[in-house]
Amino acid sequence: MTHLPHWWQNGVIYQIYPKSFQDTTGSGTGDLRGVIQHLDYLHKLGVDAIWLTPFYVSPQVDNGYDVANYTAIDPTYGTLDDFDELVTQAKSRGIRIILDMVFNHTSTQHAWFREALNKESPYRQFYIWRDGEPETPPNNWRSKFGGSAWRWHAESEQYYLHLFAPEQADLNWENPAVRAELKKVCEFWADRGVDGLRLDVVNLISKDPRFPEDLDGDGRRFYTDGPRAHEFLHEMNRDVFTPRGLMTVGEMSSTSLEHCQRYAALTGSELSMTFNFHHLKVDYPGGEKWTLAKPDFVALKTLFRHWQQGMHNVAWNALFWCNHDQPRIVSRFGDEGEYRVPAAKMLAMVLHGMQGTPYIYQGEEIGMTNPHFTRITDYRDVESLNMFAELRNDGRDADELLAILASKSRDNSRTPMQWSNGDNAGFTAGEPWIGLGDNYQQINVEAALADDSSVFYTYQKLIALRKQEAILTWGNYQDLLPNSPVLWCYRREWKGQTLLVIANLSREIQPWQAGQMRGNWQLVMHNYEEASPQPCAMNLRPFEAVWWLQK
């Protein structure tokens, strides 16, 4: 399948967590003017769009994913005038704007929910209410953040559903009035020049209307990719996404390839593309996140093969290692010590060689690491604090849990962007809302830009190559060493061209046999000072990666 690509099919998107990007007021919290301040930096990197995580009015129970007003900007972040200026300034540099839409739930501070507390209000039907007794919820479904997924409301003597925090009440998508209001939100932002939407946990919007007990789990099988999810997204697409030319990416929690082939079908009847997270659970032994475990690289490669081959010519992938909910990838699958730079470059080269739209999370392009927090008071994340309390309650050792948090907490990616080696890494003149990484004096944007062999310039080149080489957009995917736990070697083919990507996933030198690599190759990318101009038998250095292209 080849045609002129949509902008996002050969583009790269940069994710900004505004709270931790740049503070311009001294409040200790980043803001929209801080994003404007660094647009030239993002333009230099070469990204096509920026996705901003929520900056709407919010009590900040879940860092803005508890929205109290979808069309008002939280004063902490600025004003609508600031936002309009951001759009204008970004577009003048060829950078599009993507906003985060949290449509599975609202904050319990939202006007709709406040109205819904009255049983007679039409807004009651905007949420999911069920009968029960004060100590007996309607079913045994669990919240993603721990505890029951139901919260009792004494005045109206019913429970409401919250798949996340109790302050995040799930919307009732069965109600057409809810869908109509959410379409208006999309229209509001499209009118202000927004080019795309990232839809938070959007495959959870349709619940099994029977709300059955889950005898084998936490309830997720009754609302994940639920009965009407495709129908609802088809309607949103028909009424808003397509008419307004919005690119859409759905965050898909615990989804399947088969569902994503429908959500992100190239026919474009639901969404443009999907995020799935299976590849970021290869260090969750038995599916358990709160453990210390090395990644299973054979499983990682198997998952990428499954999705690359399963989506090829059928649907569109989003490619990512990092976001605001995941630890830093170089700490997780690479190295924080002497091999940090080649490891960060290798991980970038492996991902950006694949089919799909790559996403870069702020700081990933300079190889930022986890911050190495040592005290529970360092953490801000509701999920981390809840899990620590719950597991301590179960008798688990505090030091063990702190080691797990230092490896797995969502706060690992939420520390301030490291701009310079100055005070607070150049992020704020005030007291930062969360502590800084302990290595910002060495790892920062200023240092990266001054060093032409830094991780930054590898990302810059990968972004440029995506526009230059159509094989990256359209080629197929073949894993050449699926069973190796230390080498990742894949080939992509398209219209008589071949791209070969090889990578050493380990700290040790690894021999690689080139096999039947005939013909004339061009060396395209490498992460050490020099590399073989042709694929041949070689010893790959720690975290070494090479791309060759045959035309």
From Swiss-Prot:
The active site is at D200, E251. One of its GO terms (cellular component) is cytosol. The record marks D325 as: Transition state stabilizer. Keywords: Cytoplasm, Glycosidase, Hydrolase. It is found in: Cytoplasm. Pfam families: Alpha-amylase (PF00128), DUF3459 (PF11941). One of its GO terms (molecular function) is alpha-amylase activity. SMART domains: Aamy (SM00642). GO terms for biological process: DNA damage response; oligosaccharide catabolic process; trehalose catabolic process. It catalyses: alpha,alpha-trehalose 6-phosphate + H2O = D-glucose 6-phosphate + D-glucose. Its EC number is 3.2.1.93. Its main location: cytoplasm. Hydrolyzes trehalose-6-phosphate to glucose and glucose 6-phosphate. Can also very effectively hydrolyze p-nitrophenyl-alpha-D-glucopyranoside, but it does not recognize trehalose, sucrose, maltose, isomaltose, or maltodextrins. Belongs to the glycosyl hydrolase 13 family. This is Trehalose-6-phosphate hydrolase.
